[in-house]
């Protein structure tokens, strides 16, 4: 079963890097993006600003919604209103029969998608602003990974399946290509994905690993923008499926304007520990790569991207035990911010302070501020602070009123 991982509440434990090809250097710039779209246009429907969804948390810029996990069969869905600085309970969910798939929002309604009974039952629960809750089953497998104000979308494998918020209608279109490799994120009203371009179809099944590897050695990984409204793709760039330097790994972090941002990590081949992190961007209009910022050290480290209204704004480039290195997309400046690393997660948990969690529409940033305990399990306590003050090293927080039973 395909599941997306928690990106927000577990930020302290994440390393956002995944193995991928090497990025071309600025001197070896790729050609500008092709403008020709591939695929047969389907009947168009409205598509807004797409957001990628994950199983346990959602952020809108004005609020965040998350599922807590304390080991009980019944757990709450909590909403944190940034303007009020208060976290409240929306409803309880039954984890004894529900496996979280995604949380998303349209208008003022929060939608919680889940499956059950060995992935044979698929459903979503609508949580209305008046507090009412409505559970609706879905007639076929549906694991949505994107949403906008009009619909939820399951884009994977060979198809794009769309669930209309107003009508509840489920429609499916075959993707206009084969050999989907990965789905990376939303870029406005389109989805950035990669597909494998090879001279021969990829060998399938057990026992064909060597043959598959041989085909991939001579294949390309092509980055495309997929438009779910018209069921077409536009090529952005391609590169060898396997990088020349196997000790480099790359992860897509987000977009801002015409630029796509990637984090590139150089690792120690023996220990796989990161030695240097570099933030690079690809300009879709010019077709050129640019190195934005880099940092190096001796600690294990990944990238943590933070977006607002869908666009990348801030990146944690490096993390030591007591200092974060951040890079601002807006002004190109680099900042060193103190923080306290999380220590343990039980009753004796300490630290977990001043790590960024989310950006808010009113110019603040949500950060960790120690712990709150629910059913004896430690969960992050939050606080809010002006973004400029945070980057300057201030800790003049406004504490969030956390929900507890």
Regions found by a protein language model. Give the residues of each.
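Bacterial signal peptide processing site
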Residues: 18-20
């Amino acid at each position: 079963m395909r599941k997306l991982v928690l990106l927000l509440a577990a930020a302290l434990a994440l390393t956002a890097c995944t193995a991928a090809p090497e990025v071309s250097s600025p001197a070896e710039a790729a050609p500008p993006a092709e403008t020709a779209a591939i695929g047969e246009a389907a009947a168009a429907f409205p598509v807004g600003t797409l957001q990628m969804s994950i199983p346990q948390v959602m952020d809108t810029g004005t609020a965040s919604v998350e599922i807590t996990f304390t080991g009980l069969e019944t757990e709450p869905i909590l909403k944190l209103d940034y303007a009020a600085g208060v976290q409240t309970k929306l409803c309880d969910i039954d984890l004894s029969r529900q496996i979280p798939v995604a949380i998303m929002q349209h208008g003022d309604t929060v939608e919680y998608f889940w499956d059950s009974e060995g992935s044979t039952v698929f459903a979503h629960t609508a949580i209305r602003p008046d507090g009412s809750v409505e559970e609706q089953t879905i007639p076929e497998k549906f694991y949505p990974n994107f949403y906008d104000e009009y619909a939820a979308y399951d884009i994977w494998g060979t198809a794009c399946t769309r669930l209309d918020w107003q009508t509840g209608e489920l429609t499916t279109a075959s993707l206009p290509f084969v050999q989907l490799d990965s789905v990376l994120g939303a870029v406005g009203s389109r989805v950035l994905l990669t597909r494998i371009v090879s001279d021969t179809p990829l060998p399938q099944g057990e026992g064909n690993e060597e043959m598959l590897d041989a085909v991939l050695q001579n294949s390309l990984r092509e980055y495309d923008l997929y438009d779910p409204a018209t069921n077409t793709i536009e090529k952005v760039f391609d590169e060898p499926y396997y990088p020349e330097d196997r000790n480099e790994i790359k992860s897509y972090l987000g977009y801002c304007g015409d630029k796509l941002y990637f984090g590139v990590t150089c690792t120690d081949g023996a220990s796989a520990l990161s030695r240097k992190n570099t933030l690079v961007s690809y300009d879709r209009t010019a077709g050129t790569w640019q190195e934005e910022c880099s940092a190096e050290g001796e600690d294990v480290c990944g990238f943590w991207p933070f977006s607002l209204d869908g666009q990348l704004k801030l990146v944690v480039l490096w993390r030591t035990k007591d200092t974060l290195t951040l890079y601002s997309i807006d002004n190109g400046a680099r900042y060193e911010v103190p923080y306290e690393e999380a220590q343990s997660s039980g009753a004796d948990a300490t630290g977990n302070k001043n790590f960024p969690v989310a950006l808010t529409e009113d110019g603040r940033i949500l950060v960790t501020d120690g712990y709150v305990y629910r059913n004896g399990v430690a969960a992050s306590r939050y606080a809010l602070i002006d973004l400029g003050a945070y980057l300057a090293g201030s800790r003049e927080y406004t504490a969030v009123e956390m929900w507890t039973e």
